[in-house]
Amino acid sequence: MLRVYHSNRLDVLEALMEFIVEREHPLDPFEPEMVLVQSTGMAQWLQMSFAQKFGIAANIEFPLPASFIWDMFVRVLPDIPKQSAFSKQSMSWKLMSILPEMLPRDEFVMLRHYLSDDTDKRKLFQLASRTADLYDQYLVYRSQWLNCWEAGELIDGLPDAQIWQAPLWKALVEHTEKLGQPQWHRANLYDRFIATLEAASKPPEGLPSRVFICGISALPPVYLNALKALGRHVDIHILFTNPCRHYWGDIQDSRWLARLVTRQRRRIFEERSIPLFKDSATAAHLFSEEGIQDLPNPLLASWGKLGRDYIHMLSDITSSGEGDVDAFVDISSDSLLHNIQSDILDLENRAIAGITAEEFARSDKKRKLDPDDRSLTIHMCHSPQREVEILHDKLLALLQDDPELTPRDIVVMVADIDSYSPFIQAVFGSATGERYLPYAVSDRRARQSHPALQAFISLLSLPDSRFISEDVLALLDVPVLAARFDIDEEGLRYLRQWVNESGVRWGIDDDNVQEFSLPPTGQHTWAFGLTRMLLGYAMESSQGEWNDVLPYDESTGLIAELVGHLASLLMQLNRWKRELMQPRPLEEWQTICREMLTDFFLPDSDTEAAMALIEQQWQAIIDEGISSHYDQPIPLSLLRDELTQRLDQERISQRFLAGPVNICTLMPMRSIPFKVVCLLGMNDGIYPRALAPLGFDLMSQQPQREIGRAHV
């Protein structure tokens, strides 16, 4: 059974899920509830809601849709590995091996030209990664293409990039077979999975008894088809937040519309049913010849493209109409915000532009608003700093006016959380006394949240480093690195002064200077500065020069040991510079991360997680390459770029919903109900963000309905 619950309020859908868990078919106590979500924030909110309702929330799993679907493949079909051999990372390394062998072929003349000057393999690695990412999307949205390419066939009407993408995909499949890895991937598994479930007279062993899908704004068509087949044996409840009670999707053709007009949704907890269309008799006039619905509400039409496609797909998989449940909640028209929401809910357009005098004088659609209505406000500010200051003032006013409102009832969603984090810290963090608001910033990139992560990336750049004095001293700003060399804040202040006054500018020594094709001068290097500092400990500058070096007088007494600590740091930097310069096979890079962390960091309780994240991601990169049998030496720069990208993708979200004001990134899946919702950084060109597609992305050049593409 597959059932879709439509409601304009997520808390109503969550209450329905609680009702089903409590009243309908209780599971075996040892069988986990399966709830598909699209973000950890949604999972946290659902757990808290369950705990509040039942007193405890335990034995609940919150998988992402892609991992859940693959897990179902493993449970239903024989000989399916737990990890796909066609994951994005695995395909990247395999393409690194395959591409050089295929470049001499005529179809690859464009790639051959692009990779002609690539001594460090950086272009090859980037091309392999981008192509793997594209194939990963094809597996979900164009699986039929890959099946044809695998059979040696081309697709009519595709752009020229197909000429090399098709044979490259076939070579990738053959290479995977040569490695002895399973050739199963999502493109060739969906049909087999669906056919197996449809042919089964009883549920295959290991399937969950019940599955909820909550808080997901869109799923790809192949996922929905797989869930539809799974629904023959499993109770599947799709809880869909739908802003409009009437059908507002598009149609395929007139016959599809004829079936749709007869469909009805069953009203929750009632015996009556409700038609999908506001007026079924005139439904045919709503659609163009192409099947596009002319929505009367302009806001829903312009902002609801993703939802419109998803509505179409949901109506297709519940073609009988018996699986649709109406749980919409009426909205009173007592404020500006509620009027807008009510218009969307009822698919109305009561807006009056008032461009002409006649339109301005009309009153049939006008609604009276309270001059003091602040349910929806827009603030135009001259800078991000001012945006955050106004936000802080408004939140204080709201909390003062409403004694029942608490900081945890407020969410601030930011279009670019990384850019606004410094301003948020400056405004919210500097407030004291009655103006202080507890707050928690989620979803920042891990690299920006932990200085140790950025310090490690800087250390991986040692082979190319000029050892500029400020860059080296900046490493000591990281407490766990400074602690490894026994340098505290006061010691760092002394060292900054000494380094500047002793004339250190850049370069470890003269040999390092010569590496940049510059003549050695014997001055302004770290070796020169350390010599001056150590001489200053042994003699005074008034005694003259020693071997043409004038002693530096400040590094004397008990604090002179700082020079030794600084020298230890520079020795380690120089040693690792030489160690990291040569390309190595992946097996030899495996232990480098642990050794560098040991040599440069003395972790404390605050940074242990960051250190573990570095090692975890490093090992994942190495293991993926080794499992893909990539055996060529690679330079450190490739591993550094990949590690940097992965750390940027890691978002720190564990403090979301922890109690203070929730400040997070703006995500369509984070539709968690709050009493106050604030948006920051909604500037032109920033949101919605326009992402230019790859020049060889065949999907962007031949678009179809690609529901959920940006959210999988």
Task: Walk through the language-model features, giving the residues of each.
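Polyanion-engaging groove/track-forming segments
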Residues: 1-709
